[in-house]
Amino acid sequence: MVEREKKRQKLVLKGKLSDTRLHNRCWRCGRPRGYIRDFGLCRICFREMAHQGLLPGVVKASW
C-alpha cells in the first residue's frame, strides 16, 4: 500500500485531493471492487477470513 500513500501525497501537493478521487481498497489485497466498508475488505478476503473465524461476530446466515 506504499503506492497508494505516494499517490495521495502527490495529490496533496497538487491540491487535487478530495474524497471523490480516493477509491476504497481492500487493506489485505488492494482490490478496488466488491469493497465492504465496515471491515475494509473486499468480498473475497471477507469470505476467506470469515470462514477461518478471523472476523469476530461474523456468522454464516441461516434462515
From Swiss-Prot:
InterPro entries: Ribosomal_uS14, Ribosomal_uS14_bact, Ribosomal_uS14_CS, Ribosomal_uS14_sf. GO terms for molecular function: rRNA binding; structural constituent of ribosome; zinc ion binding. Binds 1 zinc ion per subunit. Keywords: Metal-binding, Ribonucleoprotein, Ribosomal protein, RNA-binding, rRNA-binding, Zinc. PROSITE patterns: RIBOSOMAL_S14. One of its GO terms (cellular component) is small ribosomal subunit. The keyword Lipid biosynthesis does not apply. It holds the Pfam family Ribosomal_S14. Transmembrane segments: none annotated. Coiled coil: none annotated. Its cofactor is Zn(2+). Zn(2+) binds at C26, C29, C42, C45. One of its GO terms (biological process) is translation. Belongs to the universal ribosomal protein uS14 family. Zinc-binding uS14 subfamily. Part of the 30S ribosomal subunit. Contacts proteins S3 and S10. Binds 16S rRNA, required for the assembly of 30S particles and may also be responsible for determining the conformation of the 16S rRNA at the A site. This is Small ribosomal subunit protein uS14.
